[in-house]
Amino acid sequence: MRGNFMSSIEKLGGLKQRLTITVPAEEVDKAYKSRLLKVARTAKIPKFRPGKASPAVVEKLYGKAILQEVGSELIQSSLREAVEEHQLRVAGAPDIKMDKILRGEPFKYVVNFEVYPEITLESLAGETIERTQVEITEEDLDKMLEALRKQYAEWKEMDRPAKADDRVIIDFEGTLDGKPFERGSAKDFQLELGSKRMIAGFEEGIEGMKPGESKALDITFPADYPSEDLAGKAAVFNITLQKVMAPELPVLDEQFAERLGIKEGGLEALRQKVRTNMEKEVHHHMENKLKMAVLDKLIERNPIEVPESLIEAEIDHLQQMTRQQVAMQTHKPDEAKKMELPRDPYREQATKRVKLGLLLAEVVKQHKIKADPEQLRARVEEVAASYQDPEKVISWYYTNKQMLSEIESVVLEDQAVAQLMSELEVKDQAIPYEEAVKQIQQ
């Protein structure tokens, strides 16, 4: 309908705007007649051959429905043209309120919407961030190998008092003021002493007990205990120790290396593989930490207002991710889909993600960044490496445009971050491996 309508725009404050569009009566009638004739050519009406009923008959039967369809078509075409005419960058889905459409009268509707913010990027020049360097010593490597030995330990039943690092099988019943409380008891419960899996005083109280011995422990729940019914309360746990088991660690030799998939090179090859895995883990974490530091600087230097509609959409996305995680953990997808989740806890994260998305898109645009084919290939290979047939997965990605574009977005983001890093000063800071592990676990 190119240009056959009137439109006016009103700025409502912030990123909110309103379009008022009026389509002249003659355009409404023209569109109605055209639609009526089109329907008449294909309509199947009793007592008439297909397409042979007169427009008057068709109008009597379908006039109201045709008029509604015309309204939808006029909105679609005129709104698209109005957005182009006013050079609007509409964010999210617009809210359309329309008057009743009538033949012979102008058709008016109002569109409330948000626009994307105008962004003028500020350089990060003058900013400083710290890059963490982690050195893995031989002592760190020895500790990791010892941890691996413990993972592959065989547990032998012992006829002696329990001590730290033992695995015990117990029956216990907890009471408050002499009454059992929910989830306060268990039978044949397996516990490793020193794991700090239970509240303070529980595991320590078992140390020194002998198999078959029973004991009452007076323990107070911490004030910040997650269950409000138990927080700060004094409880009594009646415990019976069934079994004491101690770990028998495998010898650190070529046979142990073979158990871990090392077919050649023996212990030396195992040490190298373990060191490589340790380096990969800390490198991945520290790279992410560095990336987030750069992105935080980007947000600090470029405060922008973001469309509320995009924040709400991102909250929906984050909630969907939560439901998927719950479904995987519980193996109850139907229940997870129905989970009622509050929106406010997601708002801060959603707002930050939307800001970063807009700012990074501007970095890519301003610096004319294109996804580097070599980096893209490396990313695809990294993903494919975790599958049984990597080459097949790689081929699948390169024949699936949608999936490849998702990895391309990650590569573009990495390249944008690299561009930002070139603008600021990076200072290296060395920390011990144990400190790096603590940061990873936080």
From Swiss-Prot:
Enzyme Commission no? 5.2.1.8
The protein's matches in Pfam families, at most eight in alphabetical order, are given as: FKBP_C, Trigger_C, Trigger_N
Q: Which GO BP terms sit in this record?
A: 'de novo' cotranslational protein folding; cell division; chaperone-mediated protein folding; protein transport; protein unfolding
Superkingdom of this entry's organism? Answer: Bacteria
Kindly report, in one word, the top-level EC class recorded for this enzyme: isomerase
State what this protein does: Involved in protein export. Acts as a chaperone by maintaining the newly synthesized protein in an open conformation. Functions as a peptidyl-prolyl cis-trans isomerase.
Q: Which HAMAP family match?
A: Trigger_factor_Tig
Q: Which family does it belong to?
A: Belongs to the FKBP-type PPIase family. Tig subfamily.
Q: Which PANTHER family match?
A: TRIGGER FACTOR CHAPERONE AND PEPTIDYL-PROLYL CIS/TRANS ISOMERASE (PTHR30560), TRIGGER FACTOR-LIKE PROTEIN TIG, CHLOROPLASTIC (PTHR30560:SF3)
Kindly provide the name given to this protein in its UniProt entry: Trigger factor
Q: Which organism is it from?
A: Coxiella burnetii (strain RSA 493 / Nine Mile phase I)
Taxonomically, what lineage is the organism? Bacteria, Pseudomonadati, Pseudomonadota, Gammaproteobacteria, Legionellales
